[in-house]
Amino acid sequence: MISTSEFKKGLKIEYKGEPYEIIDFQHVKMQQRAPIVRTKIKHLKTGRVLEENFPAGEKFEKPELEEKQMQYLYSQGDSYVFMDMESYEQISIPKERIGDAIYYIKDEMIVDVIYYKGEPLVIEPPMFVELRVAETEPAFKGDTASGGTKPAKLETGLTVKVPFHIQTGDLLKIDTRTGEYIEKVKE
């Protein structure tokens, strides 16, 4: 059982018989009332985000989630095909279920696929990925004085803010949790 005092971002709970992930939470103590925990939770099957208030100390079941390592093979229409690294079984996962994780996945990349009751729910790419810059504006002399950033479109379609010295073709390290540029990878 998971208590509201153990809440943290990314924690998965079972609420009303369904799996949810905690996106954000805040402990609130109101005058002359019992404390509550304001929580934003995301339904792992539908992706719908709810805002719920739970009494402090309420307990939740931990959902029975299974994690499998799978290799991304290719996209086929509106779905993506992954291969189980143990059984070599191939599964097709709809685009809606993958969400923004698709921006961090390249061909043949190993990802974690979270299953709930035998059904694939969520794709979790590695914490950091290396992606190549597909296009970005060239740097102009004098741009570096302000230490600003410019947008860069990566090979997967993701757009990130990068320093001015980054050029098209550079390999970048990206944090998949925030979608932010970390550093230029030396090749």
UniProtKB/Swiss-Prot annotation:
The keyword Cytoplasm applies. SMART domains: EFP (SM01185), Elong-fact-P_C (SM00841). Its main location: cytoplasm. Disulfide bonds: none annotated. PROSITE patterns: EFP (PS01275). PANTHER family: ELONGATION FACTOR P, ELONGATION FACTOR P (EF-P) FAMILY PROTEIN. Belongs to the elongation factor P family. This is Elongation factor P. It comes from Thermodesulfovibrio yellowstonii (strain ATCC 51303 / DSM 11347 / YP87).
